[in-house]
Each structure stands twice: as structure tokens, then as C-alpha cells.
A protein has these predicted regions:
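An alpha-helix initiation/capping motif
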Residues: 40-47, 51, 133-137
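Rossmann-fold dinucleotide-binding core
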Residues: 1-35, 44-47
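NAD(P)-dependent dehydrogenase/reductase Rossmann-like domain
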Residues: 117-181
Length: 181
């Protein structure tokens, strides 16, 4: 189930053996994945935002909250905290290696997140209710659009669009994810 209808990026180079690349593509296709070809740097930028940053955030949130709890405060931790920090349960050694291998792209993703948090902090400091509501509304809207896109028909269409764009070399990343339009 993990790889069924998942997007799998294969990052071959000019020096890659075509037969080997074909075997790798066949492997992922056999697992039910939709294989696309991307340059390594593009792949690294995408996974830094979509996979690595969430893992970093889960660990940072766990460290920031659990590392500062006083006796009895853990009783206040609910399902939101549980769900948000689930990714921190991953192998620390594996995530150390991933972070070391993709440090530059992860740093950029963190910079972008810090800019968002700075905007939020400024709005909180100024008690700007409208800015705060817009911040949370945007987060809600982006998530709803993403969830809606997970439905099979639209997901398959987006995968087809992403594949076509990647093959044309026309893959643009926007601040909040991939431009699917």
C-alpha cells in the first residue's frame, strides 16, 4: 500500500546505464508507483519540502515541547501533538544521514518556514487578528486542496501533468508546493 499510486522520482544522469534505469523504473512500476524522471537537484528540493522538512519539524516540536514539560503537563498533550510528532519516531541515524546528504535543500526549506513563522510572530505581537485569521485560513485552504487532490482521478491527472512537465523540463516549484496548473 505504501507505494501504490505514489510518485517515485528516478534521478538518472548522462552516465547512467539505460538498462539499469529501465530496471529501476520497472521495479517501482511493479510496486504500483508512478515513475517520473527528475534531475537530482530538483528531486532534492522537492523532497526537502515534502518529506525532510516534516520530519525535521516533528523532531523540533518534540524537542521544544517534551524537553520543557514540567511534572503533570504531559496530561495536556492531545491527539494533535501525537499526530504532529509521529514522524519523530523514525530512525535518528537514518534521518541524520538524510539531513547530511540533503543539507542545502533542507536549509532552504527551513529558511522558508522561518519566514512564515516570523510573519506569524509579527502578527501575534501586533495582535493583528485579520492577519492571523488569514494565516490559518491559508493553511486550511492549502491542506484542503491537497487532500482533494489525493482522490484517485485528480491524483492520476496531477501525476500525468507532473510527468509531462518533468519530461519537458518545465517543473516549477512555488512557495507552497508544486505548481500543478
Amino acid at each position: 500500500d505504501l507505494f501504490e499510486n505514489a510518485v517515485c522520482a528516478v534521478t538518472s544522469t548522462d552516465q547512467s546505464d539505460a538498462a539499469c534505469v529501465a530496471r529501476v523504473n520497472e521495479f517501482w512500476t511493479a510496486l504500483g508507483s508512478h515513475v517520473i524522471s527528475l534531475p537530482a537537484a530538483e528531486h532534492d528540493t522537492i523532497v526537502a519540502r515534502t518529506s525532510h522538512l516534516p520530519h525535521v519539524l516533528a523532531s523540533a516540536l518534540g524537542n521544544a515541547v517534551l524537553g520543557r514539560l514540567r511534572e503533570g503537563e504531559a496530561a495536556f498533550l492531545g491527539t494533535g501533538f501525537h499526530d504532529t510528532t509521529r514522524l519523530a519516531s523514525g530512525s535518528p541515524a537514518m534521518w541524520r544521514d538524510i539531513a547530511m546528504d540533503n543539507a542545502s535543500a533542507i536549509e532552504q526549506a527551513i529558511d522558508d518556514l522561518q519566514a512564515e513563522l516570523a510573519t506569524l510572530k509579527t502578527a501575534l505581537n501586533a495582535r493583528e487578528a485579520a492577519v492571523l485569521e488569514t494565516f490559518f485560513a491559508m493553511g486550511q485552504e492549502f491542506r484542503q486542496q491537497w487532500i482533494a487532490g489525493l482522490e484517485d482521478g485528480e491524483r492520476k491527472e496531477r501525476i500525468a501533468q507532473a510527468t509531462a512537465r518533468a519530461r519537458r523540463g518545465d517543473w516549477r516549484l512555488w512557495r507552497w508546493g508544486v505548481d500543478w496548473e
